[in-house]
Amino acid sequence: MLRLLMFTRADGCPDQDLARRCLDEFELKPIELNISTEHDAARWLMEWAGCLAVPTLVAADERHDPIAPPLPLEPCRPVRNVDRGSIISEPTRDGLRAFLIRHGFLAS
């Protein structure tokens, strides 16, 4: 079963707030993993995304692993709104919507 994970942090940020508003609008409830309070969450995010960018959303399997290895980033490219297949970090509203549709979390 496909699951939607969202990495967050305790002090929040505008991108995290935007993602939450969009997910509320889309009536989706992700599994939130807080990198400020959950050590494993920070480690997983570093391993998968290569940085601690929040929010990062992951299309995951039952074990909460990405459904496929994230696509690599081009050298020196920021992660903001880059759809890397199974993950997207700091998405815009349109980027998040496209990611959710592609993975079947949201109807087109």
Where are these regions (language model features)?
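Local sequence-structure signature of Cys/Sec-based thiol-disulfide redox active-site neighborhoods
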Residues: M1-E32
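Thioredoxin-like thiol-disulfide oxidoreductase module
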Residues: N34-L52, A60-H64, A98-L106
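Non-catalytic, surface beta->alpha helical segment in thiol-disulfide oxidoreductase systems
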Residues: D61-S108
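Conserved residues at beta->alpha junctions
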Residues: A10, S36, E90-P91
